[in-house]
């Protein structure tokens, strides 16, 4: 244990918490413009073609964001809303695009977890 004199000299340092989504700069979401929409393959042992987009955010930072859900209407110059949240099997992808906001359409025919994918309730 330190002496009182040592604490007077140095003091206690609180741990610095590193943010998991630095490009958002503390905001819950940020708007951006798609610069490139493409597919990429996940790490082993998974196998797929994951849909991702390079997005230039309003702060000037360019990030890679995942496009969740089945099918999308995004292309270059689409305006999107980006939130934090990494994709475990895609290295370097720490953001997700919000479905059903701005230029991004919701997932068609989605029955469960509709609010996450911007899907409207289907009429019977």
Swiss-Prot record:
Extent of Basic residues compositional bias: 111-124
GO biological process: translation
Any one cellular-component term (Gene Ontology): small ribosomal subunit
The entry's keywords: Methylation, Ribonucleoprotein, Ribosomal protein, RNA-binding, rRNA-binding, tRNA-binding
Gene Ontology molecular functions: rRNA binding; structural constituent of ribosome; tRNA binding
Tagged with keyword Ribosomal protein: yes
3-methylthioaspartic acid: modified positions: 89
Disordered: region residues: 105-124
Quaternary organization: Part of the 30S ribosomal subunit. Contacts proteins S8 and S17. May interact with IF1 in the 30S initiation complex.
Family to which the UniProt record says this protein belongs: Belongs to the universal ribosomal protein uS12 family.
Protein name: Small ribosomal subunit protein uS12
């Amino acid at each position: 244990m330190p002496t009182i004199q040592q604490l007077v000299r140095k003091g206690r340092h609180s741990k610095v918490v590193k943010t998991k989504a630095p490009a958002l700069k503390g905001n819950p979401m940020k708007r951006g413009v798609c610069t490139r929409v493409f597919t990429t393959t996940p790490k082993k042992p998974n196998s797929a073609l994951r849909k991702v987009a390079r997005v230039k955010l309003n702060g000037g930072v360019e990030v890679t964001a995942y496009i969740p859900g089945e099918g999308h209407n995004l292309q270059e110059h689409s305006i999107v809303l980006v939130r934090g949240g990494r994709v475990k099997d895609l290295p370097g992808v720490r953001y997700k695009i919000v479905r059903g906001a701005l230029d991004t359409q919701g997932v068609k025919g989605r029955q469960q977890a509709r609010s996450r994918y911007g899907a409207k309730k289907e009429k019977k």
